[in-house]
C-alpha cells in the first residue's frame, strides 16, 4: 500500500539521553527510505501486515499518514 508519511516534530526530536530519534527507529523498523521532502514527507510502500504498527506510531503523534 503506497502512502505518504508526514514526520512530526516529536519524531525528529533528539532525546537528551542519547537514544535514537523516533524517526530513525521507525525508518529502521519498517525499512523506509531516509528521504524527507522539503515539506517533511516521505513516500512509502507499507505491507498490510505492518499497517497496524504504523497506525500506533500515528496515534502516539510521531507521524501523520496521508493518502495522496
Protein language model regions, located:
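Short, mixed-charge low-complexity intrinsically disordered segments
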Residues: 44-68
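Short, solvent-exposed S/T- and G/P-enriched segments that are highly enriched in secreted/extracellular
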Residues: 38-42
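N-terminal acidic leader/helix
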Residues: 1-37
Amino acid at each position: 500500500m503506497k502512502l505518504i508519511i508526514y514526520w512530526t516534530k516529536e519524531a525528529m526530536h533528539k532525546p537528551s539521553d542519547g537514544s535514537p530519534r523516533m524517526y530513525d527507529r521507525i525508518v529502521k523498523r519498517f525499512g523506509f527510505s531516509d528521504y524527507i521532502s522539503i515539506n517533511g514527507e516521505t513516500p512509502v510502500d507499507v505491507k498490510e501486515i505492518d499497517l497496524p504498527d504504523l497506525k500506533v506510531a500515528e496515534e502516539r503523534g510521531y507521524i501523520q499518514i496521508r493518502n495522496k
